Amino acid sequence: GVRRCGKSTILKMIMERLKAQHNIPKERIVSCRYDSMEYEDMTAKQMYAQLKERLSPDGKTYLFLDEVQEIKGWEKVVNSLASDFDVDLYVTGSNSRMMSSEISTYLTGRYVSFRIFTLSFGEYLMFKSHYTEVGEPKTELVDYVRLGGFPATHLQEFSQDEVYTIVRDIYNSTIFSDIVKRNQVRKIDQLERVVKYTFNNVGNTFSAKSISDYLKAEHRALDNETVYSYLEKLEK
């Protein structure tokens, strides 16, 4: 799922359920968040060694690995742990490579995947009911479409400007951390023009050529191959 859609919260809920309903001791629950600076230079071998060190000798260990795509080769680590030890693994990630055929090859028959989305309209109403009175459905639907469904924007009553600030921060972290940094994009202004076009044409059919033609008309020409390259990076 996309950044800030609630993946980490879902992991925490599973951990709490294991402790409360299944009496799993906390010593057998291991949680790591790999977008932390603590793991910035970690290799797959180091990841494997660290997790192996934290496995419980007294029964199944439950491993919760958040934003695992930050570690190159993480899928080999997960496969090795699943093969060699008594573990139950839960992993999250923020890009489409989590669903790639390469990963499926490593983990064949050993995983179930879930796509996590932002709040549905029904979930939005449920969130809102915790801190204020819910209005007429049509009015609430307009607000939902305008403000979006990121959980962080509906944890309390925010002004429209505050919501836009939160969403802008999520956008910036997605563009700069997940796309620019990972793909070493140098011409960020070009990428943002392509992003803006796609946002403005949600629900419409478009191609790399139509984007290129539009930007050319705006005197900001980009060739088809460059546009396609940016779209490919955005998709991943």
Regions found by a protein language model. Name each.
Residues 3-4:
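Walker A (P-loop) phosphate-binding loop of P-loop NTPases
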Residues 8:
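Walker A/P-loop
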Residues 28-61:
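Short glycine-rich substrate-engagement loop in P-loop NTPases that contacts/grips substrate
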Residues 56-74:
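Conserved P-loop NTPase "ATPase switch" module shared by AAA+ and STAND
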Residues 64, 88-94, 115:
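Structural recognition of the conserved hydrophobic beta-strand(s) that form the central parallel beta-sheet
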Residues 80, 97-113, 127-129:
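Short regulatory helix/loop adjacent to the ATP-binding pocket of P-loop NTPases
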Residues 131, 135-172, 180-181:
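Amphipathic alpha-helical "lid/sensor" segments that cap RecA-like P-loop NTPase cores
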Residues 160-236:
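Accessory nucleic acid-recognition modules appended to NTPase machines
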